[in-house]
């Protein structure tokens, strides 16, 4: 018998398109590392790309983690949204 759960465990994506005055870059790097399992250098490089004006797309483990990352990045003054499939 299959047990159905309401949490989506399929991979999800987050698009980060920009930043606002007061952006907390170090905290954003840490949040991205935690959600995406990237290393420090990779996460730092992605944040630097956003700061330079290039949007990025991050792969995360599931929709819940993706939503948490979007919320965290918003608090850190980065513009992010879930990528719909």
Where are these regions (language model features)?
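Short, amphipathic alpha-helical interaction segments embedded in low-complexity terminal/linker regions
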Residues: 1-85
């Amino acid at each position: 018998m299959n047990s159905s759960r309401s949490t989506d465990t399929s991979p999800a994506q987050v698009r980060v398109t920009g930043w606002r005055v007061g952006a907390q870059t170090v905290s954003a790097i840490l949040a991205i590392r935690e959600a995406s399992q990237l290393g420090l250098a990779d996460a730092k490089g992605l944040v630097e790309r956003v700061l330079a004006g290039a949007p990025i797309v991050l792969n995360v483990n599931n929709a819940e983690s993706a939503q948490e990352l979007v919320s965290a990045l918003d608090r850190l003054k980065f513009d992010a949204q879930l990528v719909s499939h």
